[in-house]
């Protein structure tokens, strides 16, 4: 019924949240985001951090939330992996791969705040 959000989250090995990058799914084709907007939403970020800590998740997590008929956000998916649109977060300035590698190598990691951008993904036909 309402707006759908995908949120990329990274947590350290103690389930402490390092970053959350929410994005509105403005258009999808066959379940894949083709238009998205990175947004700043403290409520969404807190909800994601809370559920990830409760579940003791670690590493890269991809969550999806959707507004119900009353506009209330509900979790619809929690995936312990990179999502298909995680690259959108990288385009917004948050390099998830670098953060994960730093965590694995026990290095101090720098986490940038995401740039609030819109992204459009295009597919091309290829004839061989």
Regions found by a protein language model. Give the residues of each.
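ATP-dependent carboxylate/phosphate-activation module, predominantly the ATP-grasp catalytic core
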Residues: 1-56, 79-101, 123
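Short, flexible segments with low predicted structural confidence
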Residues: 44, 71-72
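Peripheral (often C-terminal) accessory segments that flank ATP-dependent C-N-forming ligase machineries
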Residues: 68, 98-128
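Surface-exposed helix-capping loop/turn segments at secondary-structure junctions
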Residues: 54-59, 108
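A short glycine-rich, hydrophobically flanked beta-strand micro-motif that places a catalytic Asp/Glu
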Residues: 58-70
